[in-house]
Amino acid sequence: MSGTKDKAKGLANEAIGNVKQGVGKVTDNEKLRAEGKAQELKGEAQQVKGNVKDAVKKP
């Protein structure tokens, strides 16, 4: 997978995670909030992975 795809997937996961956290907070659902936080962190990691891939590609 290219760095750009990793970054895009990361942004999507981060956004979905934020939504889950918000819904979990509004509905007082700690499990959903935790799932959202985990997905947000996954998204952040994917973005870092994409940035590293792009950095390695550049001469």
Curated annotation (Swiss-Prot):
Coiled coil: none annotated. Transmembrane segments: none annotated. It holds the Pfam family CsbD. InterPro entries: CsbD, YjbJ_sf. Residues 27-59 are annotated as: Disordered. It comes from the Bacteria. Residues 27-43 have a biased composition (Basic and acidic residues). Belongs to the UPF0337 (CsbD) family. This is UPF0337 protein PP_4561. It comes from Pseudomonas putida (strain ATCC 47054 / DSM 6125 / CFBP 8728 / NCIMB 11950 / KT2440).
